[in-house]
Amino acid sequence: MSYSIVRVSKVKSGTNTTGIQKHVQRENNNYENEDIDHSKTYLNYDLVNANKQNFNNLIDEKIEQNYTGKRKIRTDAIKHIDGLITSDNDFFDNQTPEDTKQFFEYAKEFLEQEYGKDNLLYATVHMDEKTPHMHYGVVPITDDGRLSAKEVVGNKKALTAFQDRFNEHVKQRGYDLERGQSRQVTNAKHEQISQYKQKTEYHKQEYERESQKTDHIKQKNDKLMQEYQKSLNTLKKPINVPYEQETEKVGGLFSKEIQETGNVVISQKDFNEFQKQIKAAQDISEDYEYIKSGRALDDKDKEIREKDDLLNKAVERIENADDNFNQLYENAKPLKENIEIALKLLKILLKELERVLGRNTFAERVNKLTEDEPKLNGLAGNLDKKMNPELYSEQEQQQEQQKNQKRDRGMHL
């Protein structure tokens, strides 16, 4: 039995929106995700937009068109909700490309009913990964025109109801799909996902720090520009310094005739000020031209952009890993159920065999068959404890229960 899978999450900044845009529209040159088959990327398609979009600009346009709230939108308001719709490979293996597209068309129909057609940003189907899936995005505008991700997404209970409605929608369209169990229902709070989220949050914070550095650099640059301009203005002002013309006697020793030498005499204090101004002019001229030309800011912006690209790639790698892990987990659910059924059947058969042979003969045969296989022997012992708990001490039962709990947690990771 295949499953209907729908996920939704809030996107908390324009930077993350840009990262999602690059992943959804395949804008990066290289991807760490090995599941992407670039030879099939041309098969991807968007059911909303004919051409690639700038998601942040598109969000602003949607808000301009559909927001009717009276309050000014906060700068930290969540303007973007991102989600994913898919099933498992067993389902898609039995679908032609046209059938797959029709499935996602029905999924888009559901999204339009839930969020409003005008609020849908994109519905991009990826056919170049192992399992076809659709990324979708919406602006969280309520029916009465307010921007509220909290109200549109809702709490855990609302998310569960949302997943129920999606499963019912696809069933009504003729798809025999079971509802994928939510992580809230199964309590599958995986340590790896938590680590991915922590790393994602780290990169978000790292970007914020770099952005603050950029703002600080720009402010410092503006301040330096003002100081340099002030120094230049000072240098351009006419200098009114008291001075005397230097003279010398001409003629004989007793002559009183004097003439100007062409030099001037100023005070030591004024001379020192001249030296300071000359030094200031020398110091600022090269730096001023560097800043005035824009090269300083361009160089710093280039450095910040390079760091920004690295952070976006890191965030994308983490989000891809998160998606892949969730997909693997969903695909593993039927296997886990089959294993549990097989174990139940095995216990029934072994119990019947023990009844027919007698416990002692049964134990001897099992020990003989597994004496060279320690793991099999241990498994047989564990099964026996489950089939005949009354034959074991309370302490042994508690130890076995603890082992089972650890094993179950391992199966959820």
Curated annotation (Swiss-Prot):
It comes from the Bacteria. Residues 188-218, 403-413 have a biased composition (Basic and acidic residues). DNA binds at residues 45, 115. Coiled coil: none annotated. Pfam families: Mob_Pre (PF01076). The keyword Transcription does not apply. Keywords: DNA-binding, Plasmid. Belongs to the plasmid mobilization pre family. The interaction of the RSA site and the PRE protein may not only serves a function in plasmid maintenance, but may also contributes to the distribution of small antibiotic resistance plasmids among Gram-positive bacteria. This is Plasmid recombination enzyme type 3. It comes from Mammaliicoccus lentus (Staphylococcus lentus). The gene is pre.
